[in-house]
Amino acid sequence: MGKNIFFNAHHSPVGAFASFTLGHQGNTGGFDLELAHPPDQNIYIGLQEDGSKKYLALPFFGQGEDERARYTSEQDAIKEESAAGVEALSQAEVGIQTEDGIQTEIHHQVNNATSVYIEPFSEKEITRTFEAATDEWQAGDISFKLYSPFTSVPDPALAQEEELKQAIVPSIIAELTVDNTKGKNTRQAFLGFQGNDPYSSMRHLSDTTDGKLCGVGQGRHVAIATLDERVTSASFFTMEGILEPRVKENLHFGLGQVGALLMDVPAGEKQTFRFALCFYRGGYVTTGLDTSYYYTKFFKDIEDVADYTLKHSEQKIAEAHKANQLVSDSSLNEDQKFMLAHAIRSYYGCTEFLLHEDKPLWVVNEGEYRMMNTFDLTVDQLFFELKMNAWTVKNELEQFITRYRYYDTVSFPGDSKEYPGGVSFTHDMGVANAFSRAGYSSYELHALDDCFSHMTHEQLVNWILCAAAYIEHTGDQAWLKEQLPLMEECLTSMVNRDHPDEAKRNGIMGLDSSRCMGGAEITTYDSLDISLGQARNNIYLAGKCWSAYVALEKIFNDAGLHAQAQTVAKSTKMCSYD
């Protein structure tokens, strides 16, 4: 890995639109469920220094807010609930020497009047091993490893229930290893977070499982849990208050926003603790269409998710190591492997496997924009999805057919006369869990000629390319037969957008959709200048048109539709010449 090891990465279950984001210094990560950005939570992963009340932690926290001030008077606010009888709170500024010599600071609210305080490890003390499905940090006597396995999601129409449960359980696995073999004293380690959901309180999972699970969570949506009896759960206003309570009974305090799991490792021992980091969203989660997460068919709540994950953790860890090989065993160079591993993680962090009227519905959200099944990205992710689970490609294509297909007319720029157009598809299916109305995207506006205009022609060729690749990869002849009439419609629509006079066609787009209402169509390069942004007579789009024509020619010839194949062949030839 390169010099900079402090970058955020997604650590995501498949199809849960969730990520445990971690890696950048400060409070820049945490439990991300359906968000457009990292949640900026304090994540606490640390270990007590031998024979001291100083704790060293991985640097994934910043200034912590003490919720106590909301409940107490100004005089009471300066009193700390601790064994030492503390009198004042202050802000600690801890300097970290970076590799380039620049002094940076991580701020965290600590209790300077006691001997308990938390410092981050220095950058030079930390190493990181980053792969497609595992991510490990090592510093001092601790190591912290995350497993976010990914595997093929079985087709729900064919799979057994257990296969699907294993593939889409909404959780990842963490391991914290403490090496106290050289220590002279028992040392305490911790794993916790400061939640920032204003609508949910921190809670203990032991309360709802009769003590079977040890864990902390915020509301019903996120949790850290273990089956390890060596671990104790705790919650309080601050992490420091958890590490030095007045009495241990106070660790079950209900008002604080910090929750943590505590572990004591005796001198001379090395111990590993395993945790499930879980997500759950029950009930309907979208508007426009009433959908729920597919995993809710198998798991009734987050406790159920945690229990299943921990009992199947060995299998999930084995899956993670196998998933690493997809990248590590490739012939790519190291930079390419890094980018692919990052891309895979980001992809799964955006996947949303939903249930609509008892049928599967697959969504990939567009990163921070959260637009749903943006077609420009569906075609980009096509080959990975075909490799991993081709049925999701068909599912997306069918969603475009049944709800996000429309018909238009076309016209030349500056001319209101309309000519036959044909079928096309929307840019996306909605945004931020709000499905858009049938036949319309969340993105596309009318009467524009730049960003936010319609992408009618590009989405038409995207549907053709995705459908052709799916058919070629799977050999799904039944689906091909069902879609042949639509394929013919797509051909008619493409040539109509070239020129209404067959003799004047050149194989590329020449007319704009009536949906532009006097404006002009754009391409996926919507934020660039007219050389790439304008769809009409665009060489970039011409390349996609040529590919679509080549694909259609093969499909029609294989289906015995030779007249249609000849029409396509003419456009293919003209497009390649231009």
Where do the PLM segments sit?
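Inter-helical turn/loop segments and adjacent helix faces that build the functional surface
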Residues: 180-185, 285-289, 307, 324-331, ...
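Aromatic-rich carbohydrate-recognition surfaces in CAZymes
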Residues: 180, 295-313, 370-508, 517-524, ...
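Beta-strand-rich N-terminal accessory domains
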Residues: 1-110
